[in-house]
Structures are given as structure tokens and as C-alpha cells.
Amino acid sequence: MALNDFHVSEPYTLGIELEMQVINPPGYDLSQDSSTLIDAVKPQLTAGEIKHDITESMLEMATGVCRDIDQVAAQLSAMQHVILQAASEHHLGICGGGTHPFQKWQRQEVCDNERYQRTLENFGYLIQQATVFGQHVHVGCANGDDAIYLLHGLSHFVPHFIALSAASPYMQGSDTRFACARLNIFSAFPDNGPMPWVSNWQEFAGLFRRLSYTTMIDSIKDLHWDIRPSPAFGTVEVRVMDTPLTLDHAINMAGLIQATAHWLLTERPFKPQEQDYLLYKFNRFQACRYGLEGVLTDVYTGDRRRLADDTLRLLDNVTPSARKLGADSAIDALRLQVKKGGNEAQYMREFIADGGSLIGLVQKHCEIWAGQ
């Protein structure tokens, strides 16, 4: 199958997708009523899109093309308002978090959508298990070769993005001992983790053609890589973040990725090579397991350094770019988060340690998303 040409887009523009949990009080399990909410809110939208995801307990908020994080905030806030209003009218809750802490995957209903039904046929129960919730950030690129360079550059910081956004310590009623357990769900997929090595857009087109020989890949959307190019949009899409508990944190993560993209494409600090990925999965695991307390290993020198320290270094490196893009408030907020030493997974564990229940935790998450 041939790949679409890379659509030229304005560099560093943003598009954000948030996969939200649809909750059924008073038990606070996942609901199967996302279709009801989507039908209710679609006529009220003035920007962005609200749509189905894999199962009926998921709802996706997607912005249009945004110039900066202020536009991202405006679009997401407007969508949040209409979703919360409709959820209240239908006696449902909405919340973030990368996993629901006690839902059972066997109960999840796959959406009546041709693509998702085909995916269910290919992957079986793995698709129901993929009822997990992430934030995806698209960054605009001028051409396909820039997109491949940007993908490789951003891959250096996948552990940092995971650690900052980690919000999935509980799954199936248990503490997983991971800060981000969500990404483990995809480990059985044949296209999990980093994209196979290519050095330019022409090589990527050849890779996609070969992947399509499997008959499991009809479009870029069928690939579950941590970061993937999206030629139809003219973007690179970062897919490793858990959905945050607050809109503010989602906006901060978008600002970081935008600023990092600007720094990478203007400074070109790396010369990508295949060896860069030799320890990729080990460093990714450290971020998933331990969050900001994880330890990164340099593939070339063997040096080991705390992920928190390296994240502060990243934030310093991208600060000038953030100022140019109007994203410096996001960098400042994330720097404060790292210095305080926490992420949302840590907050969740503290809630339980203080005597809270998993049901109470989901209730609290719904209140946080509603701004209560």
C-alpha cells in the first residue's frame, strides 16, 4: 500500500488529543455510554472534535490546529465545558488518568466502528485490554525529512515525557508498582515501542509499504509506535503520555513538546543513528516503573543519571524556544513539578495511603476534572 504524501503544515503548530474516562457514579466504574455523550455534545462544539475511541467507556477530545498553547487551552476548555454539562445531564462523570484503577477489561464493549471492529478481529482481547487513556500531541513539520529528524530527536526524551505525565499506578484493582502501567498494555502488540529505524522520508515510505504486506496495516492510524509521523496532518505525533488529571497539566505537556520540537529543529543537537535506540526500551522501562526517580543509561558512555536531573536539563535547554513560542509558563510549571519531586501517580498513591479507596480515588478524579 502506498503512503500519502507528507502534507506541508506550519512548523510547531499543535494538535492535542485527550482520551477521557466516562464514569458511572455512584460505583465509579467505567460506563459504556460514550455514544450518548458524543451525540449530546457534537451540536454544541464551536472548535475541535469529540469522538469515539476504542471502547464505549472512552471519549476523545481533539483540538483543531493551534498556533500556541493559549489556543490549545481555549479549545480544550470549551470542549471540557460542554462535555461536563452533558455528563451532568446524563448522570455520568468524566476524568483523566492513564488507567481506570479497578475496571475489568472483559466488560468493555468495542465501539461499533469499522476500523475498531477490524482491529478487534486482528488483536482479539488485546483491544479490550487497551481501554487505557493517553494524551497525544501533534507538532507541525514543513516536510517529511524534518518529520523523521524530529521523531528521532524526540525519542531521546520519551522517558522524560513518560515520567512527567505518569498517572496510571493502579490497574484491575491492584497497585502495579509502576508509575505508568498504561504503556505495558501495548507490549504484546507487534508494533509496540519505537518506530523501526529509517533515516529519511523516502525510507519511511518503503518501511510503510513493507508493513502493509502484513494486511494488518491499512493506515498510519494502525501503528502503535511511541512516536509516529502523520503525513495526512503534516505532523509528528507523540503518544507516550498518560491523560493528565487536569487540563493545565495537559497544556503544560503540549508546551514542553512544542518547545522541544523547536529546539531540535533549529539547533539540530543530535545526528540520529540507529545505535541511539539500543537502550531505548531499558530507559523507557525506568520511566514507566519509577517515574522521575528512574535512572537513564547513556548508550555511548555508560553514564547513569537520575531522570529528574536530566529532565531539568531538558527544561533548561528548551526554555529559549519556549519563550519564542509563548510556552514559557508550561516550562516553569513543569520545572516546579520536578523540583517538588512528584507526578500524578505519586499523588494517587498518597491518596490511598491516607485511607482512601479506589472508588474514592475515581470520585476525586472526577471532581478534579470538573474543577471542584
From Swiss-Prot:
It comes from the Bacteria. Homodimer. InterPro entries: GCL_type2/YbdK_subfam, GCS2, Gln_synth/guanido_kin_cat_dom, YbdK. Keywords: ATP-binding, Ligase, Nucleotide-binding. Belongs to the glutamate--cysteine ligase type 2 family. YbdK subfamily. It comes from Salmonella typhi. The keyword Endoplasmic reticulum does not apply. Its EC number is 6.3.2.2. This is Putative glutamate--cysteine ligase 2. It is an enzyme of class 6 (ligase). Signal peptide: none annotated. The lineage of its organism: Bacteria, Pseudomonadati, Pseudomonadota, Gammaproteobacteria, Enterobacterales. GO terms for biological process: modified amino acid biosynthetic process. SUPFAM superfamilies: Glutamine synthetase/guanido kinase (SSF55931). ATP-dependent carboxylate-amine ligase which exhibits weak glutamate--cysteine ligase activity. It catalyses: L-cysteine + L-glutamate + ATP = gamma-L-glutamyl-L-cysteine + ADP + phosphate + H(+). One of its GO terms (molecular function) is glutamate-cysteine ligase activity.
